[in-house]
Every structure is written in C-alpha cells, then in structure tokens.
Amino acid sequence: MRSTSKAIPFSFHTSLIVQCLRPLRFTSAASPSSSSSSSSQWFGFLRNAITSSDLMLGKCTHARILTFEENPERFLINNLISMYSKCGSLTYARRVFDKMPDRDLVSWNSILAAYAQSSECVVENIQQAFLLFRILRQDVVYTSRMTLSPMLKLCLHSGYVWASESFHGYACKIGLDGDEFVAGALVNIYLKFGKVKEGKVLFEEMPYRDVVLWNLMLKAYLEMGFKEEAIDLSSAFHSSGLNPNEITLRLLARISGDDSDAGQVKSFANGNDASSVSEIIFRNKGLSEYLHSGQYSALLKCFADMVESDVECDQVTFILMLATAVKVDSLALGQQVHCMALKLGLDLMLTVSNSLINMYCKLRKFGFARTVFDNMSERDLISWNSVIAGIAQNGLEVEAVCLFMQLLRCGLKPDQYTMTSVLKAASSLPEGLSLSKQVHVHAIKINNVSDSFVSTALIDAYSRNRCMKEAEILFERHNFDLVAWNAMMAGYTQSHDGHKTLKLFALMHKQGERSDDFTLATVFKTCGFLFAINQGKQVHAYAIKSGYDLDLWVSSGILDMYVKCGDMSAAQFAFDSIPVPDDVAWTTMISGCIENGEEERAFHVFSQMRLMGVLPDEFTIATLAKASSCLTALEQGRQIHANALKLNCTNDPFVGTSLVDMYAKCGSIDDAYCLFKRIEMMNITAWNAMLVGLAQHGEGKETLQLFKQMKSLGIKPDKVTFIGVLSACSHSGLVSEAYKHMRSMHGDYGIKPEIEHYSCLADALGRAGLVKQAENLIESMSMEASASMYRTLLAACRVQGDTETGKRVATKLLELEPLDSSAYVLLSNMYAAASKWDEMKLARTMMKGHKVKKDPGFSWIEVKNKIHIFVVDDRSNRQTELIYRKVKDMIRDIKQEGYVPETDFTLVDVEEEEKERALYYHSEKLAVAFGLLSTPPSTPIRVIKNLRVCGDCHNAMKYIAKVYNREIVLRDANRFHRFKDGICSCGDYW
C-alpha cells in the first residue's frame, strides 16, 4: 500500500464528487431534458410498463400514441420495441419494427435484443435474428457492442459454433474484439462449447477481465479436468488484485480438493469477508449499469454514497469512474478519482494506470497523461497504445512517433492499433512519406500488413502524401471496407486527380458498397474543383435519396460545389435546404457571392446571418472585407472592421491583412497604414498588402522606405512584394530605382522575374517618356508579352504623342486581342491628341468593322451607404439640375483660379468652345459635383471610375480640391489619385 503522506498533484475533496451531480442532473436517459421524446407523457408510461413488465399498460400506451401522435418520434418507437421486448412480446416488437419509416442503429439493436431476450428462442426465431443482422449490415455501415451482444447471446442459445466464430471475425474486423463485453461474451461461448483453447487465447488478450470471467475460466478448467491449469490460473487471479466473490471461493476450494470448506483459500479475499466482497461487486455492477445506460447523475450519486459509506473501492470502481469522467467531459472528476486511487495505492495497478492515461488523453490533458505513463513501473502494449493514440489524435505527431520508436527499443511487438495510430501521426508530418514507408517496412517485418486496419491506415498515409501508386498497390490486394475507399478517393482529390475520384466512386457503388458522409463530401469537393456540375447534380440527387443531404458536412459540400461551379441559383437552393446552417455554411455562401461577382448580395446574406444569431468567424470577416474592396464601399468596410473589433479578431493575421487591403483599395491609405502598424503577428502577406496599397496611391518614397524597413526586420520578400515595389517606382517616375530592384530581385533573392514584373518596369519607362526603351524591353523578354503590357505602352505613346511607336504597338496589341475595345480607343485618342483626324476616323472605322463596342465610361460615389452612378452627360439623377448648376459653378470658380480646359482630350474636330463644353460633363466631374452637394464640408470626396481618368479631368480635380478646400480621392483603372491643395499624389505620373 502506498503511503498516504506522498505528495499528490491534486487536492482531494469528496464534496466535489457530490457537486458534480448538480450540473449533470438532467443528463441521464430518464431525465426530462435528455431528448425531446423523454419529456413527453408517453415515455413515462412506457418506462412504468417496462419496470413492472405490464404488457397491458404498454399496449394501452401504444394505442394512445397512435391516436394522438401523427408522426411519432423515432426515439419513442425505439422505446416501444424495448417495451414489448421486456414484456415478453416478440411478435408485437417485430410488428412495430417492420412499420418504422426509418431506422437508426438503436432501432436495429432493440429488435435484435428482443430476439435474444425472447423465451421462445426456437430455431425459427434465431434464424430470423441472423437474417435481420445481414439486412442491418446492408443498411448501416457501423455497428456497436450493443449490436453484437444479442447476436452472441443467440449463438449461445443456438449451439452454432460456426456462427460464433463468424461473429468473432466480424468483431475483429470492426475493432470490437478488444471490447470487454464482446470479448467476455465470446470467452463464455467458447468455454460453453468446449473450446477451452480458443477461450483461453481470447481471455489472455483481454485488457480488462472482471471476476466473472476469471470464474468462467476456472470453472471450465475444473470441468475439463485441467487441474494444473486451474492452479496456475488461481495464482494469476491472486496477482491481478481482484477480490474474489462467493463463486470464486467455491471454485478455489474445489482446486484444493475440499468442496465443503473454502477456508484454505480465503486469503485470496485480501482480509475481506465474503459479504464485503459481494458488496463491492454489487456496487460496481450498479455503477456499470448506470454508465452504459447514460445515467451519469445516478452513477455519481452512487459513487458518492460509496465514498461516504466507507465502502472500499477496487480497481473496477476506478476504471468505471474514469470512464464516467470522459463521458461527462469533467477533468475535475477525473482528477478527484486519480487522487483517490493515489491514496489507496491502486494507481500502481496496470489497468487503473491505463484508464488514467485514456482519461487524460480524451480530456486533452496530454501532460498529465504523459506523467502517468512515465511513472508506471510496468507497462503493457495497451499502455503504449493509449498514450500514442491519444497524443497522435490531438496534434502531437512528433511525440507520438518518438514514443513508437521507444516502444520498439523496449522490445515490444506493436499490434494493429499501434500501427494505425503511428501511421496517422507520421503521415501528418513534413517528412510523412519517409516515415510512413519505414512503418510500412516494419509492418511487413512483423507480418501484420495484411490486417485490414493496418492496410487501410497505410492507404490513408500514402494518400495524404499524394503517393497514389503505393496506395493503389495496397488497395488492389484486398477487399476493403468503406474507410479504405474513402481514403483512396480523398487521396485522389488531394492529388488533384479528381477524375479518378469520380471513377472510384462509381466503381464503389457498382460493387455494392454504400457511401457515408465522408464519401459524399469528398465527391462534392472533387466536382467543385473540376467544375463538373452535371456529375455534382447526380451525386446531389443520390444524397437526397439516401438522406445525407440533411447532414451538415454533406450539405456544406453541396453548397461549396455549386458555388465553385458558378451556379448561384442552385447554391441558394442548397443553402436554403440546410435546416440550421452553421458559420461554415454561411461563410461559404458569402464567399460564393463574392467569387461570382455578387458582392452586394454577399452583404445581404451577412445581414441574414447576423439576424439568425450566428457569429461570424475570422474567415467570414476577411471575406466581407474583400467584398468591400471589390465594391470600394468604404462605409461598409468600416462596419466590417467594427464587427472584427467586437469579435476581438483584428489581431488575426488573415483578418488584419484583409482590412488593410480593404482600406487601401477604398482610398483610405492613412487608415490602412494605422491598422497595419497595429497588427501584432505580421506576415509577408500583410507587408505586401501595405506595399501594394502605398504604390497604388502613388506614395513611391513611402513604399520604398517601408520595403527597406521590412528587409531590416529579416523578412524575406517574395514575388508579390516586388510587384508592389516596382509598381511604386512606376507610379513615381523612379526608373533607376525600378532597374535596381529588378536586378536585386533575381540576384539577391533568387526570384525569377515574371510577366507582372516586366509590365511594371515597362510602365515605369513609358511614364517617364522612354517609350522606345520600353518597346525594346518588351521585345527582349524571354517570355511572350501580354496584351496588358502593350496596352500600357500604347497609353504611354498617347501621353507622349509618339504616334509612330503607338501604331506599331497597337498592331501587336490587336494581333493578341482583336476584339479589345480599349486598343481602338487608345489608338483613336492618340491620333486625336495629335490632331490627326483622318487616322482617328480610320481607327474608329476599324472598330466598327470588327463590331467592337467601346466600354462605356462611368463613375460612382457612395453617399449614406448608397451608390450613385454617373455617365458622361448623365441626366438620370433626380438632382440633375442642381448637379449641372454646380458643375457650371465649379468650372467658373476654377477658371478664376487659373484652370484652362485641355481640349486635346476632345475626340471630335469641332470649335474650341464646343470642345470645352464637351469636357465639362465627364462622369467624374458630375460625381464630384454631386459629392460637393451631398457631403459635409471638409470631408473627403471619394469617386471611383471604371476607366482611366482623362488629362483634363485630372487637371480640373487639382483646382477643385484647392478652391473648395476638399480632399478628393479618385480611383481610376490604374491607380489612386489623392487631390489636395492643388496637388495630386501621383505627381502627374499616371
């Protein structure tokens, strides 16, 4: 016995166990809140009928249910089956079962239990039960111990040895051969059928053996005349630490040769008389029944009574209580039980230590689990398996692999459970493929690679690491269950070989294997990235037919598939079909709207989400920030930022970066920079967002300064970083700086320049007036120039008046994109600026000949959360007269300040006065006039234009900002322009 004075990790309070009753008072199966059915009046009547075995009361209750319940709940019907079974009416139980519209595993377990409990265990009934079990295997993929228990009982009644062996094999296949109840029943069957050798093997493999099983083995040895084996077993029983009951004492007396006197062996009772042994057995039996029926409040009360009554607990008590702590998710209870075990010295027992490891792992306290494991004086394979599995399942893969290597060094032979756990851990690591292959070699060495669990785990490991050839070799060698099929399909999907996923799915159904939620979710994901909407619709129909469309995981997969395929109508239907969408489903719908260009709808969905009381997560916030960026809706973006602050997720790198990008793209670069400085965990994406934002706003020097700061902090730039840096050089006319960073990109960081980087450099040359150098750069590139590069160069030719180079560039641009309207427009603008009206008309004629229409230019402004759109000479606004009057006032005021209309931007050959008038009512001027009328003085006016701002409007904006003392932020197709005090942030480089 361990000294009670030893320091223990937790303080022990018996009262805490009693306190655990309060939060769990309604968690038992009989409590009102345990299900919707149990709160009804019918459940109480059924319980009374079962308790009193009153068939008449049960029938009357059934009749009332049929009268008053149009669609009785499945839980209630299951209890009807149990009632008829307990009251001895198998016929009525079967009738209720046959009429059930849909059945779950509990329904099947109930009817099988009815056959097993029937006093009429005739051959016909046994055969009917076996037939039901075969049907069950077709309808339900997974079964439980509650399914096997009645089947094993029927095997015992029937005397069918072959059936018992078949169920034993099935138990091994589904991993229940180690279950104490299933294994115990199998031991009992083998012993009753005289197969003592088989019973002994199974008995010795069991992780926990109660006194009843020991009694069965002792009795079998005695009845078969194996007295030496019985003596050895009695010694082993003494070493186990279990307390014998009265039956044990009689059997031990028979071994000693005196059936009438058990005094010679009473020392096995450890100083307790038979009555005290019977008391603890009775108490443990009650605890076990409460545990398996889910009546945790009653169990805790029973245990508290044991403690207060000074009933000495044994290892079985502690194993049951530790299992209870896991069931009710109570670390406090688990620690108190651990404390009691320490005080009584029972934590030294192997089975108790193993249960402690299991409890701490299930409650995610891996440090405690490892401490228990490290302090064990004796460990068996179950100890190793428990700690490896617990650690592997909760993200500590490296530690799990190290423990596996330590196990091998100890000379222990891993079993299928060890191998599956370590394979799961190894395959998740960066070096997962190499480790998985080493484990595979060891599995071959110890000859357990043929085990279905190990083979399936190997398939999963290879699939995770996209080594599908190795997975295929394993898969083709055996007839696998659904788990292996799922692993293969998931592997193909992860390897971007979706066509094989769909082929395997079709083959699986052809061979009669039924899908589960994981299968369907994988297939929908595959259909999404393949844009295979027709196949997706077929699988959707199958999901509806099989009832999986109501599964949240599957329904989210259906929604995501339609979103990725661009069918938002079908996506909306799928979303509306989800009974209670979670945050993932809402976010999928929101991001789908954004991906398909329906940003305003995304905000509408978000409003519905908040009305439903669903809190957005970090991904939702980041997605909505992106929507604000696309709409350049600053006010909505600010609201999203406010939501992020309320949810305390602004420190999330993903959210912070998205908000920085949103403010930058909405024209509020100061807000973007303030938020950027407050991000605590800054990654390269955040730096890139800020660099690109500054570049778009023409803050070239600030961009380069920030880039220098980033490098000083040891953050390595990537290709996106250099796009921002080169863009800043381009917009600020820093040609030499652009060349310098282009060389540094490849020489210092090993980043090969791509088309986007060359585009920025060519743009920098064009804006600086070095049009021919830009043309030479494009011609000298090793890669083919893009249409956007030629488009940028053509715009530069228009600004510089280089019609000769512009003509060559336009020819190459039209070869790449003959239907690009901007090419014709830029060409005609270039000729108009040079007063070459005949060439301009020819360009327009070419445009008409190719039936190309010019993209209409328009500008918009957001006022009071409403978007107002304007086109040239627009008179659709209800305030048109006021707006046009304001434009006239603006032109008058800025002319007095020195503004001179740049009539070169007029594309018609008319009188100068007409040219001026044509410039006055460009869309951006109308939008600014509306902004002056509709926004408070001194507040910034933010205007967005879909095309590049014309030179005259750009010049006019500088004067308007100065005369009216307003900051004007104008975002065109190329960049941001911030007009303040008569100066633009672009420095006239645009």
From Swiss-Prot:
Lineage of the species this protein comes from: Eukaryota, Viridiplantae, Streptophyta, Embryophyta, Tracheophyta
- Region of interest (Type E motif), ranges: 789-864
Q: Where is this region: Type E(+) motif?
A: 865-895
InterPro entries in the record: DYW_dom, E_motif, Pentatricopeptide_rpt, PPR_At4g14850-like_plant, TPR-like_helical_dom_sf
Q: Which keywords does this Swiss-Prot/TrEMBL entry list? A: Repeat
- This protein is called Pentatricopeptide repeat-containing protein At4g33170
Organism encoding this protein: Arabidopsis thaliana
Q: Which GO terms of the molecular function aspect are on file? A: RNA binding; zinc ion binding
Q: Where are the PPR repeats?
A: 73-107, 109-139, 144-178, 179-209, 210-244, 279-313, 314-348, 349-379, 380-414, 415-450, 451-477, 481-515, 516-550, 551-581, 582-616, 617-651, 652-682, 683-717, 718-753, 754-788
